[in-house]
């Protein structure tokens, strides 16, 4: 994993962190996150392995583990992320990595809501403090 620096991220987030997964010199995926100070939760705002042929080979897990290290170091009480209800592979991936469903938004993506079979799912993982 390598740290990614991008002025664009800095413009819209306070202290964003991003990491890239590389195969040789090619970026194959990335993850970004930041601490939501107002509620002390660490928001994983994006995680992606670009090529579907490279998924389920460990890059996504490595990216998630890396950003979770930062989430833990941040002192946040919980790590949170969102996915879409039709993305069963992502939901399974997050559950396998200790996340649970903590909320829904029927109208996040469309005013037609559930009729379009696309509900926003909020998932979270408690970060334990000693």
Cite the ranges covered by each PLM segment.
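A short acidic/small-residue loop/turn micro-motif
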Residues: 35-37, 109
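Short amphipathic alpha-helix that is part of the acyltransferase structural core
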Residues: 1-4, 22, 120, 129-130
């Amino acid at each position: 994993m390598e740290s990614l620096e991008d002025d664009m991220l800095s413009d819209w987030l306070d202290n964003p962190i991003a990491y890239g997964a590389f195969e040789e010199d090619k970026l194959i995926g990335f993850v970004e996150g930041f601490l939501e100070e107002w509620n002390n939760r660490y928001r994983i705002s994006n995680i992606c392995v670009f090529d579907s042929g490279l998924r389920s080979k460990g890059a996504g897990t490595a990216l998630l583990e890396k950003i979770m290290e930062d989430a833990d170091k941040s002192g946040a009480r919980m790590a949170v992320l969102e996915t879409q209800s039709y993305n069963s592979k992502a939901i399974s991936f997050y559950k396998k990595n200790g996340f649970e469903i903590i909320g829904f938004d029927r109208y996040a993506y469309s005013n037609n809501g559930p009729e379009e079979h696309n509900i926003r799912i909020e998932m979270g993982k408690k970060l334990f403090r000693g």
